[in-house]
């Protein structure tokens, strides 16, 4: 049985080095999809590069933890910027859900303005869309707009029922991440999904060239290792041998 494999590179628009890495991994590797931060400092550069890479499926990376929001969010920002304190607010059940709903709609419209089309799917920076308070908002929005949604099913148990018409991959893995990146690790992710019986799988990745912005990230040099692995000459053949075909959320 042929299985669908979506190799999605996060952080499109974060920096020029990140953008170039994603394009390289698409053009000369196995990356088929990406998610863009519409408030990223290099989003205009990402849009420009994407025009020469029409095969790259582009989704929207909903951002609530970095940079400036597009709408007024006094309940979530500090000094006008977003940050990781969202986790504390979630634990205190103090998230400003109406503000988050408005920001989601604004980022979505901004994506369409930038790229001239709807995103192929939705995802979020640091997976905040999987918070139990936020997930129903994002799932309902994706279903209403007819776009797919990345779902990490491990924390999903307390998030309620899914909308009937919501599209997603059957499996998702964030395991291709960390200090021990290798081709063997990537293939192990596929083998694990096969053993679970997943008919479709999204694998998250972050291929990049190193620039000053990426140097400031806690996850820096492994991004370059990811790029090496994802453009390996042997990897595409090994994927096909395992019964996977490369695709995107357009195929879900």
From Swiss-Prot:
InterPro entries: COD_ChbG_bac (IPR022948), Glyco_hydro/deAcase_b/a-brl (IPR011330), YdjC-like (IPR006879)
Pathway: Glycan degradation; chitin degradation
Cofactor(s) needed: Mg(2+)
Transmembrane segments: none
CDD domains linked: YdjC_EF3048_like (cd10803)
Pfam family, one: YdjC
GO molecular function, one term: chitin disaccharide deacetylase activity
Gene Ontology terms describing biological process: chitin catabolic process; diacetylchitobiose catabolic process; polysaccharide catabolic process
UniProt-listed Gene3D superfamilies: Glycoside hydrolase/deacetylase
Residue numbers binding Mg(2+): 125
Reactions the enzyme catalyzes: N,N'-diacetylchitobiose + H2O = N-acetyl-beta-D-glucosaminyl-(1->4)-D-glucosamine + acetate; diacetylchitobiose-6'-phosphate + H2O = N'-monoacetylchitobiose-6'-phosphate + acetate
Keywords from the UniProt entry: Carbohydrate metabolism, Chitin degradation, Cytoplasm, Hydrolase, Magnesium, Metal-binding, Polysaccharide degradation
Claim: Oxidoreductase is one of the keywords in the record: no
Top-rank taxon, per record: Bacteria
Compartments it resides in: Cytoplasm
Enzyme Commission number: 3.5.1.105
Chief localization: cytoplasm
A GO term from the CC aspect: cytoplasm
Similarity annotation: Belongs to the YdjC deacetylase family. ChbG subfamily.
Function: Involved in the degradation of chitin. ChbG is essential for growth on the acetylated chitooligosaccharides chitobiose and chitotriose but is dispensable for growth on cellobiose and chitosan dimer, the deacetylated form of chitobiose. Deacetylation of chitobiose-6-P and chitotriose-6-P is necessary for both the activation of the chb promoter by the regulatory protein ChbR and the hydrolysis of phosphorylated beta-glucosides by the phospho-beta-glucosidase ChbF.
Subunit structure comment from the entry: Homodimer.
Protein's recorded name: Chitooligosaccharide deacetylase
Organism encoding this protein: Shigella sonnei (strain Ss046)
């Amino acid at each position: 049985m042929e299985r669908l494999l979506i190799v999605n590179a996060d952080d499109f628009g974060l920096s020029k080095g990140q953008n170039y890495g994603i394009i390289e991994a698409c053009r000369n590797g196995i990356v088929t999809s990406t998610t863009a931060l519409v408030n990223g400092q290099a989003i205009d550069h990402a849009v420009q590069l994407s025009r020469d890479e029409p095969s790259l499926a582009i989704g929207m990376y909903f951002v609530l933890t970095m940079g400036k929001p597009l709408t007024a969010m006094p309940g979530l920002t500090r000094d006008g910027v977003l940050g990781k304190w969202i986790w504390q607010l979630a634990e205190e059940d103090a998230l400003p859900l109406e503000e988050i709903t408005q920001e989601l709609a604004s980022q979505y419209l901004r994506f369409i303005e930038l790229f001239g089309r709807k995103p192929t799917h939705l995802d979020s920076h640091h997976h905040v869309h999987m918070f139990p308070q936020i997930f129903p908002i994002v799932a309902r929005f994706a279903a209403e707009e007819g776009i797919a949604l990345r779902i990490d099913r491990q924390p999903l148990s307390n998030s309620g029922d899914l909308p009937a018409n919501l599209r997603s991959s059957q499996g998702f893995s964030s395991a291709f991440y960390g200090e021990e990146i290798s081709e063997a690790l990537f293939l192990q992710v596929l083998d694990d999904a096969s053993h679970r019986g997943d008919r479709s799988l999204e694998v998250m990745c972050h291929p990049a060239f190193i620039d000053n912005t990426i140097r400031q990230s806690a996850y820096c040099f492994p991004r370059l290792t990811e790029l090496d692995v994802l453009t390996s000459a042997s990897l595409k053949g090994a994927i096909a041998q395992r019964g996977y075909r490369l695709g995107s959320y357009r195929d879900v």
